[in-house]
A protein has these predicted regions:
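C-terminal segment of classical bacterial N-terminal signal peptides
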Residues: 17-25
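A local structural motif
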Residues: 56-69, 85-87, 189-201, 275, ...
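Short helix-initiation/N-cap motifs at beta->coil->alpha
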Residues: 67-76, 204-209, 302-316
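Short, solvent-exposed loop/beta-turn-alpha elements that line the ligand-binding surface or hinge
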Residues: 111-127, 185-202, 239-242, 259-285, ...
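Glycine-centered hinge/linker elements that transmit conformational signals in sensory
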Residues: 209-218, 245, 249-305, 350
Length: 430
């Protein structure tokens, strides 16, 4: 059996002087094997678990995280689940897989467990409803549908997961060049608008200005950038443009949604259709705008290989002025041992589409992942896995995770006065 649980020999039966006996005390060695993408948010969870987790049930619990590279994460997890090997007790699953693996019988329905446990109920009530919608419900319920019901847990709704790491994408930018007086003056002179320097400037940055930034900061080797001659070619902007996994759809969807298009007709479930929706005139126009900015990006953008890790590396190597990437990849940017721009980087909201009233629509995908339990665990392991969920989603652990580059989906934690100051991208996340 792949489930690893060994009962300890702590059946301690003592006879007291009165002749009464102490009831048997059972504890266990429990190993929870968890599939997880290999990146900072999951690495921190493992490190913090090993340092701080104590089982409330008295078990000796080991969290054995199987770290899998992102590009092959889905294939590896899917192969394990469909093989029948029953390797994992928990999985950090991307939310877009939820329905497929629930239908396959691999992910455990947690609805009754949540309803019977006041701690789990309180956690669910504190989670941002957009995350409950994306990470937990199947069949999928929108945030609006959940809020209309009004109860948490909502009657008639099935719940499967809790957030391990709720992610959003933000703008990473070089403050030393975007706030350089000479560059700011030249940009203003060329385009008649300001070069975004502050967080507030990025709040008012749309896709048109994003393209202007890309054009403006395209410099060749030997050109001056912020008064310094360049040793290599330099590019103004970059965002996801990769063929692997979801390394382009997570950006293209934003263009489509912001302009009023969609990628499929969800109202026709369970026979929802994409034909005529994702290739509508509105969606095609939005996709063309996405493509139009690739001309200002490094040559790798033309190869289908410019994924979230490639743009992160380009930024850290000082070859790009601004990127749009996930918060989960922000921490290495600030690491002096890994990043040439660790002391020059700042963060702001991602650009969006300007509306007729002057506002900016930043509708986009929710990133991040829930963790789920698999369906073949014994009751004792299910209970301990849920204890791990409670430990991870208590406010003390969540604030520690945020301080180390993670994010929280708990509204109480995001409302904490210290939250925005814990990491430089937190304001944009909230």
């Amino acid at each position: 059996m792949k489930l690893r649980k060994v009962i300890k020999g702590i059946i301690a039966v003592s006879v007291l002087a009165t002749g009464m006996s102490v009831a048997p005390v059972l504890a266990a060695d429990i190993t929870i094997t968890m599939a997880a993408p290999d990146w900072p948010p999951t690495r921190f969870m493992k490190e913090h678990f090993d340092k701080s987790y104590t089982s409330p049930a008295g078990h000796t619990t080991t969290l054995d995280m199987d770290f899998i590279p992102w590009p092959s994460f889905y294939e590896r997890v899917a192969a394990s689940l469909t093989s029948g090997e029953q390797k994992y007790q928990m999985i950090v699953t991307d939310s877009q897989w939820l329905g497929a693996f629930v239908e396959g019988g691999y992910y455990m329905n947690l609805t009754d467990k949540i309803a019977a446990d006041p701690e789990l109920t309180a956690i669910l009530q504190d989670l941002h409803p957009a995350l409950v919608s994306a990470y937990s419900t199947y069949p999928h319920k929108t945030r609006a549908q959940l809020e209309e019901i009004g109860e948490v847990p909502a009657p008639g709704v099935a719940y499967y997961g809790f957030p391990q790491f709720p992610d959003t994408y933000v703008t990473f930018y070089r403050q030393d060049i975007f706030c350089h007086e000479g560059e700011m003056a030249a940009f203003q002179n060329k385009y008649g608008t300001n070069l975004p320097c502050s967080y507030e400037d990025w709040q008012d940055t749309d896709w048109t200005k994003w393209g202007q930034v890309g054009e403006f900061f395209r410099r060749a080797k030997g050109d001056l950038l912020a008064g310094v001659a360049l040793d290599d070619d330099f590019y103004g902007i970059a965002y996801q443009a990769g063929k692997g996994y979801d390394f382009s759809t997570m950006q293209t969807n934003a263009f489509i949604w912001q302009q009023g298009g969609d990628i499929w007709d969800e109202s026709k479930m369970p026979t929802a259709q994409a034909e005529g929706v994702v290739n509508s005139d509105v969606a095609v126009k939005a996709f063309d705008e996405y493509l139009s900015y690739l001309q200002y990006m490094p040559p790798v953008s033309q190869t289908g290989q410019m994924d979230i890790f490639v743009i992160q590396d380009l930024f850290m190597q000082g070859k790009v002025g601004a990127i749009i990437d996930w918060v989960g990849l922000g921490e290495p940017v600030l690491d002096p041992s890994a990043s040439k721009v660790h002391d020059k980087s700042a963060f702001g909201p991602a650009p969006g589409s300007r509306k007729n009233d002057g506002s900016i629509d930043r509708t986009g995908n929710i990133g991040g992942q829930p963790f789920v339990l698999t369906t073949w665990n014994e009751d004792e392991v299910v209970d301990e896995a849920l204890n791990v969920v409670k430990w991870w989603l208590n406010s003390e652990t969540q604030l520690e995770a945020v301080s180390n580059g993670g994010q929280s989906g708990l509204m109480s934690v995001m409302a904490d006065p210290s939250y925005n100051g814990l990491r430089p991208w937190n304001r944009a996340h909230v």
